[in-house]
Amino acid sequence: AVSVSAHTHYMEHRFIGAEDGWRGKQKHHHIVNVTVCGSWWRGRKNERGIPHATMKDGAPNGYSVMEFDGAEYSLDFYAAGRPAEYQMNIYAPEVVAQSELIKTVILANIFNGSERSQVAMRVDDQGEWIPMQQASMVDPAFRDEKLREEAEPNRTWTNLPSVYHTPHMWRAMMPTKLKQGTHVIEIRAQ
């Protein structure tokens, strides 16, 4: 079974089971869908004069397309004004001292992610895929943007909503055996 709701201005997948009172054979998939207006058209205006409207879970405003084939279905997320491939934000420091690698965390906000998502990262295209762990937390970029925008004395936009602990964040530790130099982090989500 599947159901969809919205008007919460964030995206989330919930799987409702017997512990929640659901009596079906399989868990009920409830989708809290994104909104086109994101965070009610709030936030700093972009180059086109439109508020960025990032939602409180750090996901961009957008829409979903749901396709059905009998009892099977798929849900694809599309960020407004962005290419279809824009499905996540990755958070990693630009510079890390060799001695700090052991405590460096890489984060990914997989906008359409759920507890059923398999997320992994690797450093450089030859590296081993490292599983990432789901972590309910505040999107750091959303939090920082909210603080920056609220600190501006002459703002001409409406403040962003309160931060939200989103379940579609993943984290992993940076590998410690990296040579000094520039590296590329790649993240895949299935």
Go through each PLM region and give its residues.
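Conserved beta-sheet core of the metallophosphoesterase superfamily
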Residues: 1-95, 128
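Long, low-complexity serine/threonine/glycine- and acidic-rich segments characteristic of extracellular
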Residues: 88-190
